[in-house]
């Protein structure tokens, strides 16, 4: 019987390691198969709240943030690792650095709607693999439609303040917990893994949760044995 395990993931849509970590976790869950039944819940984290709503040039923003030499070598490594998990990253083709606050509002509502996983994957793929400009309303709505959204409903959320307080409160909560980088994984509200861990690390951590879920015998006395039938 599969053990139910809740996995809370603190992440940002524009974090490449969050996408890589997502793929590595998925690989781990595939390895475990029927040993676990995972409930995955995504939580908001803004890597750069200073980015304006209309976005800014990705290359210029990264050069300003890290310096031209460092950003280029850093992204080459990320592209290589992404390729190893089947993701086609090309940072030179990303049109914009974008604000993700509204995307987190959508993801918060998506959890209540039951399509958070689909929405998260669609947004990550659109940004990193398809490399499209998510600041364009029509484009974003098309992406959301592919994840099971009604365009009108999504637009109403974008035009409103729905889930704004929830997103801000969650981000404050995880900052207070000491989360300073993403992705950040919490297993059954007990164990935490920081960063895009290798799949094997996820497998080992999840198996530890499985082991600890089993009853621990703290005392033994006379009993009937199921195997031998003796009492």
Per-region residue spans from a language model:
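C-terminal cap of thioredoxin/glutaredoxin-like
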Residues: 3, 7-11, 20-34, 42, ...
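Cys/His/Pro-rich metal-binding microdomains
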Residues: 16
